[in-house]
Amino acid sequence: MTPTQTNTATMQQRWETVMMNNYGTPPIVLASGNGAVVTDVDSNTYLDLLGGIAVNVLGHRHPAVIEAVTHQITTLGHTSNLYATEPSITLAEELVALLGADTQTRVFFCNSGTEANELAFKLSRLTGRTKLVAAQAAFHGRTMGSLALTGQPAKQAAFEPLPGHVTHVPYGQVDALAAAVDNDTAAVFLEPIMGESGVIVPPEGYLAAARDITTRHGALLVIDEVQTGIGRTGAFFAHQHDSITPDVVTLAKGLGGGLPIGAFLATGPAAELLTLGLHGSTFGGNPVCTAAALAVLRVLATQGLVRRAEVLGDSMRIGIESLSHPLIDQVRGRGLLLGIVLTAPRAKDIEKAARDAGFLVNATAPEVIRLAPPLIITESQIDSFITALPGILDASIAELGKKA
């Protein structure tokens, strides 16, 4: 049954009057959230299985984040990059420790994932080389440098020519990567799991091979952990499953628990490339956002949410696949970043059917439904989705019949 949308319709009309049309008109208008549940302006409730696209790792209205933000905003809200604050220093120290590199590591804070990747692009130029390698169908952001790295021509076409000397190779194919990297390559950019393109997991050993290839040619290995980091896959950084140390790691999304923050970590010689005056951010390292991030890290550690993400993700995958529904081919991903791969390109219809049933999911590809719920989601909430899923899939089939 389609939820009531009386107030939603009014909000949608207001949206269409004043907002840019790059997103289209949102199907619902959310008003509040608590834990893994959100409520719209017509009082319909939804289990949030997308978490703001892997942002709300502690769910909505988490008391630790509220306390940290409230304390900081009533103490000191903003300083610019001209002055230091204790929360940003502490957060940098904690991220360095979590990365665990055995060489010097330095941190730069910004406001988003695309900004972190933009800096990685700029840093690569400081090597004296200009060639870059990234993956076909990858997503690294929408600002110009990050867009050049994004291996999706449909997103790039309107903005060409793009910066860069970027070569895109098939994701997961070691031979193709090895053939593209040479002694003129500045950096290789890779996601540990390709989230936007359908939660695609590379073959075992791929990231380790990428580390070997880049080391052999003196190129930087940049690992984009914007979607996979902050414990989502069952390790704090997804690349840690492969026991490698990148030269650069980019972060955002879940780091701030809902507040905008990005981070750039560089190790070894790469940590010394950025020198006085070469980059900056007015809002980067904002004390309120860094305080929120520290609260996120504390809760992840004290409540064991990183390990829990792996356990719950395995359980969720098994539960969905055991339904043996004709529309489900497989479930791929790791931890609580999962993609339900469909046997037909019905993802948009299923996203709508799920929303009508009270579940927020994302059609990240025509044949893939992405799940990235808060790491605090309960087993019973996961079970409620698995129980409802056959009906959701059947409803999407019925809707297709109406369109025919």
UniProtKB/Swiss-Prot annotation:
It catalyses: N(2)-acetyl-L-ornithine + 2-oxoglutarate = N-acetyl-L-glutamate 5-semialdehyde + L-glutamate. Binds 1 pyridoxal phosphate per subunit. GO terms for cellular component: cytoplasm. The modification N6-(pyridoxal phosphate)lysine is found at residue 253. One of its GO terms (biological process) is L-arginine biosynthetic process. The keyword Amino-acid biosynthesis applies. One of its GO terms (molecular function) is N2-acetyl-L-ornithine:2-oxoglutarate 5-aminotransferase activity. Pathway: Amino-acid biosynthesis; L-arginine biosynthesis; N(2)-acetyl-L-ornithine from L-glutamate: step 4/4. Its cofactor is pyridoxal 5'-phosphate. May also have succinyldiaminopimelate aminotransferase activity, thus carrying out the corresponding step in lysine biosynthesis. Belongs to the class-III pyridoxal-phosphate-dependent aminotransferase family. ArgD subfamily. HAMAP family: ArgD_aminotrans_3. This is Acetylornithine aminotransferase. The gene is argD.
